[in-house]
Amino acid sequence: MAEKYNLVTIVVSPLIALMNDQVDQLRREHGISIAACINSSMSIEERRDVISQIHTGQKSLLYLAPELLLTTHLQSFLGGRQVGMVVIDEAHTVTSWGRDFRSDYWFLGDFLKRTSRDGLSFPVLCLTATAVYSGDNDVVNDTIRELGLGKTIIHLGNVKRSNISFDIQRHDPAQIVGRLDDAKLNLTLKRMKAYIASGEKVLAYFPYRSQVDQIYSLISSADHIKLRRYHGQIPSPERKMTERDYKEGTAMGLFCTKAFGMGVDVGDIKHVVHFAPTGTLSDYVQEIGRAARNTEIQGIAHIDYFPSDLRYVRSLNGISEMRQYQLREMLKKIC
């Protein structure tokens, strides 16, 4: 579309790490240089440079977070060019995140309707590997309704990962001496160090940024080469360096939140450890799916489970906040 018609494809992507990973892979592995992203990790100058390259036709595949797409006039990105397609990557987030975590996802349908009223016409492609189809939890048709897509073509594939097994260890809190959270941190750290000592790459998910920082503070400075941390509040240069070193194998273990998650393709991760149960089943499937992307590897999903761990799920579900204008729009939908 870009070469023949000078059209721009916009990809709505949920995570900075995912945007960076996909743009890098397109360039490095497929020789596609027209892709770029704009996100909060970039400086004003870097953003302006990407927008300039879109305007001049040097770039034609643009990755954006929904928050930026909904709060910026579309033509400021396009510079007179037209949209050829909108791709919503990890489309299950429209419903699973839009209602309780990142409410801007819930308003993508309104954005599509507005652009249609403005005379713009383009196909919408939704991609996900974790959406339930049919039944009580029908994410596929729920997403179609939320986006107002109308008549659609649905392609279903097999997403079962036979090369991931599960290691679930249930613990009795009565056997723990001291604070439970401290014991859980030590269990997780012990696992991480053991896997790294065996030369096996490992990823550990935590519900909160504070827990990532806390466990990172427990390791010595000498261990900072092999063990890294990743969450949304870490400065952009450090995040980018961590992404690169983890892919290349300089770093072998990563403490992270879901900011490093869905779609990120690091082929040689053998172990995915959960400090506690994640927010939703879709989130969990996405997170353990980081293991064994190379199908020749047998991946393992681990969790040291305590009955009180469900408090994290309840807490995460209550964290999200909606802006005033979103509350007004939501009331319009309901009424």
Please place each PLM-identified region on the residue numbering.
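Post-DEXD/H (motif II) to motif III coupling segment of the RecA-like Helicase ATP-binding lobe
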Residues: 79-80, 84-85, 92-156
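Conserved interdomain linker/interface between the two RecA-like ATPase lobes of SF2 helicase motors
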Residues: 152-213
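Loop/turn-to-beta-strand initiation segments
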Residues: 7-9, 58-62, 82-85, 119-125, ...
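C-terminal helicase lobe
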Residues: 194-260, 264-335
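Conserved RecA-like helicase motor-core motifs
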Residues: 31-42, 150-156, 203, 222-237
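Catalytic P-loop NTPase motifs of RecA-like helicase/translocase cores
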Residues: 18-19, 69-70, 93-102, 133-135, ...
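Conserved Walker A/P-loop ATP-binding site and its immediately adjacent core
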Residues: 5-30, 36-42, 46, 65-70, ...
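Conserved helix/coil segment N-terminal to the catalytic DExD/H
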Residues: 24, 42-85, 93-99
